[in-house]
Curated annotation (Swiss-Prot):
Catalytic activity, reaction form: 2 [molybdopterin-synthase sulfur-carrier protein]-C-terminal-Gly-aminoethanethioate + cyclic pyranopterin phosphate + H2O = molybdopterin + 2 [molybdopterin-synthase sulfur-carrier protein]-C-terminal Gly-Gly + 2 H(+)
Keyword Hydrolase applies: no
Localization in the cell: Cytoplasm
UniProt keyword annotation of Ion transport present: no
GO molecular function per UniProt: molybdopterin synthase activity
Protein name: Molybdopterin synthase catalytic subunit
Start-end of Polar residues biased regions: 1-10
Signal peptide: none
Entries under Pfam families matching the protein: MoaE
Amino acid sequence: MSSTTPTTEPDQLPPHLDPQTYPRTTTNPTLNTHITLTYHPLDPTSALSKISSPNAGANVLFLGTTRNSFEDRPVAQLSYTAYPPLALKTLSKIAEDAVAKHELLGVVIGHRLGDVPIGESSIVIAVSAGHRGAAWRAGEEVLELCKEKAEIWKKEVFVDGQGEWRANRDRDAEGKLVQG
């Protein structure tokens, strides 16, 4: 059973969002899944601590970061937007399905919204499992499913001021554009 909890820290929210009703964190204590959408920098140490278990033989942590160029174009930043109620539901299902499929001990998925500067993380994924094989496979699978299914969109903002909106699924694991 998942629960959605609005967090109370004063995020840098766009003015049309009410921080008291904006659902940013969903947890399932039974399956040890934790989903967060935030305008704050992501905390990998916190992600690992949420899934830490004495039964774990492996913890895998992935951080997706904003790099300074894409296809020889200098990037200024990435900007993310989402439909939070549906994105939280989708990300929760991805995490819960991964726990069942890979016999995981826990999953954290955190995604930044708003502007993400060069060098900062836009996504954190942490998985915990009894053995490394399951953890490695699950971590990559969770990432690819997040990019494929989550209702989160990014705008690549280039140094020249131009930008391109993209669904995360527009690129493959090597970062190449997927032709529709």
